[in-house]
């Protein structure tokens, strides 16, 4: 599996402390970095799907707007901007269990 490049870092990543999985592909990360900063470093801008099925990007970056909700290690609706990366973490963007389930009548 090809590793995702971090071409959009503000400053080049000097030392990768770990690898996480982003949408099934490995990407390097540094200790103390947030999930959102890793996502944005790869160039991905639309990170979530809201409860209406629309694609949204991170807005505030500080946990207030809830526009960066992703699935982390199987748990839905985690704020990417408030979650620090951990080795082996599995991150899935554009996932929303509300819009992925079929409505029941």
Swiss-Prot record:
UniProt cross-references to PROSITE patterns, sorted A to Z: 2FE2S_FER_2
One example GO MF annotation: 2 iron, 2 sulfur cluster binding
Iron-sulfur listed as a keyword: yes
InterPro entries: 2Fe-2S-bd_N, 2Fe-2S_ferredoxin-like_sf, 2Fe-2S_ferredoxin-type
Domain 2Fe-2S ferredoxin-type: residue ranges: 16-97
Subunit structure: Heterotrimer of HcnA, HcnB and HcnC.
Catalyzed reactions: glycine + 2 A = hydrogen cyanide + 2 AH2 + CO2
Family annotation (CDD domains): fer2
GO cellular component: plasma membrane
Protein's job: A three-component membrane-bound flavoenzyme that catalyzes the formation of hydrogen cyanide, a secondary metabolite, by transfer of electrons to a cyanide-resistant branch of the aerobic respiratory chain. Contributes to suppression of black root rot of tobacco.
Induction of its expression: Transcriptionally up-regulated by Anr in response to Fe(3+) in oxygen-limiting conditions. Post-transcriptionally up-regulated by GacA. Stimulated by glycine.
Domain of life assignment: Bacteria
Cell compartment(s), UniProt: Cell membrane
Pfam family, one: Fer2_4
Organism: Pseudomonas protegens (strain DSM 19095 / LMG 27888 / CFBP 6595 / CHA0)
Binding-site positions, [2Fe-2S] cluster: 60, 65, 68, 81
Protein name as annotated: Hydrogen cyanide synthase subunit HcnA
Keywords of this entry: 2Fe-2S, Cell membrane, Iron, Iron-sulfur, Membrane, Metal-binding, Oxidoreductase
Enzyme Commission code: 1.4.99.5
Nuclease is among the record's keywords: no
């Amino acid at each position: 599996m090809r590793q995702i490049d971090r071409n959009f870092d503000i400053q080049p990543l000097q030392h990768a402390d770990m690898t996480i999985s982003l949408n099934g592909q490995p990407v390097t990360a540094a200790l103390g970095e947030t999930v959102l900063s890793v996502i944005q470093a790869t160039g991905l801008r639309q990170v979530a799907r809201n409860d209406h099925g629309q694609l949204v990007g991170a807005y505030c970056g500080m946990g207030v707007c809830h526009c960066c909700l992703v699935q982390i290690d199987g748990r839905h609706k985690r704020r990417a901007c408030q979650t620090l990366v951990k080795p082996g973490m599995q991150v899935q963007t554009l996932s929303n269990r509300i819009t992925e389930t079929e409505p029941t009548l």
